[in-house]
């Protein structure tokens, strides 16, 4: 069982808190009973790592791929996915983690 934390691209609830800003609270509230998927604002590999570090089990996003598809078709999507993957790998190396399971809230700095 899982729940999706989303603001629907900001077009439904434009005044609500961003999914990431409330992610840790939601993860704490549901505990191990429900997996939490973060959706909304996921446009870079580092966004995925931040969400996973905050406790999400997965991330979802569509704009990144849709923009690439509209701009350059299948080649654009393939390049976008490759860049996304490279961003995740590079950020993990910079953070000193070898596995996603090593991510945790202690690696996040909230403003």
Each language-model region and where it sits:
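Glycine/Thr-rich beta-alpha phosphate-binding loop at enzyme active sites
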Residues: 1-26, 30, 71
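Alpha/beta catalytic cores of nucleotide-metabolism and tRNA/nucleoside-modifying enzymes
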Residues: 21-111
């Amino acid at each position: 069982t899982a729940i999706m934390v989303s603001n629907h691209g900001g077009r439904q609830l434009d005044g609500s808190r961003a999914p990431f800003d409330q992610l840790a609270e939601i993860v704490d509230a549901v505990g191990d009973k429900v997996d939490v998927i973060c959706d909304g604002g996921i446009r870079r590999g580092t966004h995925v790592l931040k969400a996973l570090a905050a406790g999400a089990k997965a991330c979802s996003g569509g704009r990144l791929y849709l923009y690439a598809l509209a701009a350059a078709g299948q080649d654009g999507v393939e390049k976008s996915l490759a860049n996304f993957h490279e961003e995740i790998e590079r950020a993990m190396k910079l953070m000193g983690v070898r596995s996603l399971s090593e991510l945790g809230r202690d690696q996040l700095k909230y403003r």
